[in-house]
Every structure is written in structure tokens, then in C-alpha cells.
Amino acid sequence: MSTVAAYAAMSATEPLTKTTITRRDPGPHDVAIDIKFAGICHSDIHTVKAEWGQPNYPVVPGHEIAGVVTAVGSEVTKYRQGDRVGVGCFVDSCRECNSCTRGIEQYCKPGANFTYNSIGKDGQPTQGGYSEAIVVDENYVLRIPDVLPLDVAAPLLCAGITLYSPLRHWNAGANTRVAIIGLGGLGHMGVKLGAAMGADVTVLSQSLKKMEDGLRLGAKSYYATADPDTFRKLRGGFDLILNTVSANLDLGQYLNLLDVDGTLVELGIPEHPMAVPAFALALMRRSLAGSNIGGIAETQEMLNFCAEHGVTPEIELIEPDYINDAYERVLASDVRYRFVIDISAL
């Protein structure tokens, strides 16, 4: 066992504080990682504030982890000391169900072991990337291509794969009309990835205040949803819509933006259920779907794609003592577009 510094939430109402946690010694199949950077995800905030259920306090958040291998177990074959690696949203799964055997471990039937706020197979709570080091089974570690700087690679492990997976699953590419609802941490990755895949990307946002950013990031067009005329102009105009926001929406308005056989994919998690108008689905054979991060192989594919196409998130690098301020700014939508913690300053 080793002791490392970390930032943890002790309750739903207290700010995160600096503390120490223990990490297991690497087993035969484990990789020990010196964490260099950790992204801040809105999921971190939902979890520590107990908005998605009661956490196992203390909680060390962070599932966008980039670092360097410091040691490997005796039977590790994929990595060696000095390799640049990442860890995403989960660190283990059952490896036996039909989700795991198909490479979509995020949908593990018994439940994946998440990077934090889960109970690992050793019976101990998992703790995330707001810490100096982590030990992970090699099968749940990602290789970060050399051309990707570690700080911008970190948010790809959640924000990147959350958008890449549905874009790939619903075959976004040339001659595909894709709309991204929301231009935040997730949405800006949807624009960049969709454009890199060759899709015709449109941003749908409440106002036009980020229009310049949206077009610079690769969108072909940008519309304000606060303007009722937007929904008339764009009716039937998209093959795929990815909803990255967590606010409750009038689903009927957005479903009517889809062409025949179009799909609206929910990526955000609204606080309250939303009504689904059956006519908007049935009359044009539209679909309403959801998507959640991606499997290990697909996440590696995404990293390689980003390296090949020069796709990286736009980040604001912060020191650990700024985490609580960063949380407040995320809640105020005051970041363009992802916070990344410099763990070397921990």
C-alpha cells in the first residue's frame, strides 16, 4: 500500500479538501500510474453533491486521468514504465456478460466498477483522479498517442468518448446532418468530432453568444433555440441530434427537427422525466435513444482518431487549490470549455 495526496469531498455540503488516500500495491495484472492531469467533469459535481444518490464519502472524484506508468505487475504485457496512459470512467467490469464480451464494458450487466464512488473487487471504495497516483488493471488503461499533450488528452477520456461513441454508432460522416444541442464541455467536443468525421454540423444553443466559437470549432451553422422561428426553419433538417444538456426540454420540438428515420440521442441526464410525444416519433419513423461513454476498445479508437485528426478539447488549466472555484464556475457555465487540474501542483 502507498499513501498519496488527493482532493476529496467529505460531504455533500462541504468544499473539497486536501487529504491523503491509500493505493494498493500493483498486482500481477496492474499498472501503477503517476497522474499528471485530471479533467473536471460535471458528473464529478453531481456525485459529490449527492445529486445522483448517496456517495461513499470521502469521495475523490476524477475520471479523466492522464499520466505516466511508474510500475507494472509481473504479468502485464500491454504497458511498461514510462508509457503515456489514461484512465476513463471505469476501472473494471465483470468481463463475462454479453456487454463485456462485445467490448461495450460501460454497459456491463452486473455493473462496471467506476473510477470513483464504486466498490472494487477487493471490497474497497474506488477513488479517482484528483490524486497523485492510481493503480488500475492493464485491461482498463488507455494508451495516449505521443502527439496528444497529456493535459488536453485528459478530457477526451469522458467528454471525448461521450460524443465519439454516438457519432460512430449512428454513422455520422459525409452527407450526414448532425445537430449538437448545447455548446459546453460536451457540446464543443461534438462539434469538433462531428466536423472531423465529415458531417455537416449545426449547433443549437439558447442564444447566439457562443456563435463565433461554434463556427470556429467546425460548425457550419448555429441557431438560437430561444427564437421560436428556429424550429420552423429547421423542421425535418437533421439525421442525428445529440443532446448534451441536462435541462428538461420540449422533446417534441426537437424530434420534429429530425428527418425520416432520424435519431435524437440523450447524453445529458435531466433532473426530471420528460414527456415523449408519440406522434413525433411514429409519423416519421424517428427514434429517441441514449448513449453512455464508450468501451475500452472504442475509447482507444477515439484517442487514435483525435491524434490523427488533431482534435483536442479547449481547456483551462488550474491548480488543485482552485477546484472548488472551478466547480462554481462549471455550475455557472463559465468555462470554455473544460477545466483540467495540474496534479503536479498537488
UniProtKB/Swiss-Prot annotation:
Keywords: Acetylation, Isopeptide bond, Metal-binding, NADP, Oxidoreductase, Ubl conjugation, Zinc. There is a cross-link at K209 (Isoglutamyl lysine isopeptide (Lys-Gln) (interchain with Q-Cter in protein Pup)). Its cofactor is Zn(2+). Zn(2+) 2 binds at C94, C97, C100, C108. Binds 2 Zn(2+) ions per subunit. Zn(2+) 1 binds at C41, H63, C158. It is an enzyme of class 1 (oxidoreductase). GO terms for molecular function: alcohol dehydrogenase (NADP+) activity; oxidoreductase activity, acting on the CH-OH group of donors, NAD or NADP as acceptor; zinc ion binding. The modification N-acetylserine is found at S2. InterPro entries: ADH-like_C (IPR013149), ADH-like_N (IPR013154), ADH_Zn_CS (IPR002328), CAD-like (IPR047109), GroES-like_sf (IPR011032), NAD(P)-bd_dom_sf (IPR036291), PKS_ER (IPR020843). Its EC number is 1.1.1.2. It catalyses: a primary alcohol + NADP(+) = an aldehyde + NADPH + H(+). Pfam families: ADH_N, ADH_zinc_N. GO terms for cellular component: cytosol; peptidoglycan-based cell wall; plasma membrane. Belongs to the zinc-containing alcohol dehydrogenase family. This is NADP-dependent alcohol dehydrogenase C. It comes from Mycobacterium tuberculosis (strain ATCC 25618 / H37Rv). The lineage of its organism: Bacteria, Bacillati, Actinomycetota, Actinomycetes, Mycobacteriales.
